[in-house]
Structures are given as structure tokens and as C-alpha cells.
């Protein structure tokens, strides 16, 4: 899973 999306941002 994309942990950066968990953090609340994903470009």
C-alpha cells in the first residue's frame, strides 16, 4: 500500500 497516501499526500 502507498504509505505516502496514508500520510495524506500523493502527487
UniProtKB/Swiss-Prot annotation:
GO cellular component, one term: extracellular region
Tissue occurrence: Expressed in placenta, specifically the maternal caruncula tissue (MCT) and the fetal cotyledonary tissue (FCT) (at protein level).
Keyword rRNA-binding appears in the UniProt entry: no
Source organism, top-level taxon: Eukaryota
Keyword Hydrolase part of the UniProt annotation: no
Main location class: secreted
Assigned keywords, A-Z: Secreted
Annotated compartments: Secreted
Family: Belongs to the fetuin family.
Name recorded for this polypeptide: Alpha-2-HS-glycoprotein
Organism: Dama dama
Lineage: Eukaryota, Metazoa, Chordata, Craniata, Vertebrata
